[in-house]
Amino acid sequence: MSATTDAGQLAAFHRCSTAEEYFTLLEVDYDPRVVAVNRLHILKHFAGELAKLPEAGADAANPRHLLHDYRDALVRSYEAFTNATALDHRLFKVLKDRAPKSAFVPASEITVERLGSTQPSETSEQTEEAR
């Protein structure tokens, strides 16, 4: 691939607007069913991966290196959703807000009731008193 082609491909990268365009341009194989279900999550993860990359200014002279980094970031983002679900990653606020809370129970709150330790008449009386 020539430097001109790399520069053109980098310019095309900046014009991409769909997940499929990114996959096609960066030549990443994908399952359309996975993308259909996780499109926004993959793109959000991809944006986060791109943000972690070093500043592009240093690589502007080497678009091939930059495109390689972008491809690796897209592969990581796609694989994140082939190995786990959107609920596992919780990238969006609506999912983060609904994250399950840990159910911590201190040991002092745990009690053990033994079967047959109460008399049936006592249990009946307690039930009637509760009404």
From Swiss-Prot:
InterPro entries: NifW. The keyword Glycosyltransferase does not apply. Pfam families: NifW (PF03206). GO terms for biological process: nitrogen fixation. Keywords: Nitrogen fixation. It comes from the Bacteria. Disulfide bonds: none annotated. HAMAP family: NifW (MF_00529). Belongs to the NifW family. Homotrimer; associates with NifD. This is Nitrogenase-stabilizing/protective protein NifW. It comes from Frankia alni (strain DSM 45986 / CECT 9034 / ACN14a).
